[in-house]
Amino acid sequence: MSAHGLPAPSRDDVLAMAQRPTSPSARRLAFYAAGIGLAVFVYALVVDPDRAWRAFHYNWYYFTAISSAGVTWAAVQRITTARWSRPVVRLMEGFVAFLPLAFVDLLLILFVGRSHIFPWTHTAPPNPERALYLNPTFLVARDIGLFLIIMGLGLWFVYNSLRLDIGVIPESGAAWAKGLRERMRRGFGDERREIHTTHSRNGVIAVFMVLFYAYGWSVLTWDFSLTLDMHFQSTLYGWWSFMTAWLGAILSISLLTMWFRNVMRADHLIVTKHFHDLGKLSFAFTAFWGYLTFGQYLVIWYGNMPEETHYMHLRLSAPWITITTIAAALAFLPFFGLMSKAAKVYLPTFIGFALSGLVGTYLQRYTEVYPSLYGIPKHAPLGVVEIGVGVLYLGTWGLCYLAFMAAFPKMRIVMQTSRYRDEIQVPVDPRTMEPLPAHE
């Protein structure tokens, strides 16, 4: 990825763009979606609580994994010291806004809805090892602990990033975060020193974010998806699942970048080359996701081990095969559609393929969860309840994200405008601020 060779904009110009408000209609739409979805969920709780909680669990799994992946994308930009993404990395950081609410939903799933979701709550595990792993106390403790670590690292990383901007700009933003912004300004020192300090601190945090994203979501995937079928096992399952979220995150980031470029009127900062880069990443991780999907299928199917093949056979049988086929086709379509540069930089085609990938991965999550819970029903339970709870999550995710963007600058300011912004490529002595000698 290149830095695109763009000249440094003025701080006043970037600040004006970063503080432009989003349309009130976007917040209203998210609010109405959340309200309608909540009504559907409450109605389903009364009529069919099993189906309601399973829809809640499935949508939590999809939206929370993508939110965690989105902020981890920002961590990767720090690890690689990327310059090309400086105008868009705040849009990645905004994904962290949903995680506190997702944690509350996690507690609801584990303490209120688990008997409606997980077979191991009312069926004995098939062997002592799985009984030990699925011990409720052990499972709840590790899931809550891992999620708190993942969320805490993400919030810490984004707090440091925001502080670097909040410390140099006048007070502005949503009233609910005024106290937090004031806290960020306390003790803010020399700009050059703050840049290096923040860069170094976030460099350490970013490494742990990536490690805990991979490990934490592997474990969460085992507990929230793999164990729904207590007789199935797969060593690739965790990788495959968290890479599904990784792909969904970069597709979501691409769509948000297109929208917020218009909101901020930042056409001269977020340029065609940014969409080319985002398109290349979307194409690459679609290919990698397809590789993992086919690789898992190939090994399981031709390995022909009964404890594994029944998982694939179920999803390739009626009534699930139709949804499985549609999910695979939609999720893999961006691989073919985004091969050319023209498709990446022409926004209507990019939007179409990004939406295709997101819907495909959404349905793929469905095929992860529902066949294990329902076996072979007459009809696949994909209706008003599942879609309604999906709308609930989409609306609440949108409200969290828009609240974050209303409270903080929508774009990194210091790292685009400071004359010291490129010094971070060279480590300095924290006491003297002089470059450290290079090691031959």
Annotate each predicted stretch with a short phrase:
Residues 96-113, 284-293, 352-360:
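Hydrophobic alpha-helical membrane-insertion segments
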Residues 317-372:
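Extended, compositionally biased non-globular segments
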Residues 21-43, 136-327, 340, 418, ...:
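Long, contiguous internal "core" modules enriched in hydrophobic/ aromatic residues
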Residues 65-75, 104-108, 143-155, 243-258, ...:
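Hydrophobic cores of alpha-helical transmembrane segments in multi-pass inner/ER membrane proteins
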Residues 44-60, 76-89, 157-169, 228-230, ...:
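Juxtamembrane/interface segments at transmembrane-helix termini
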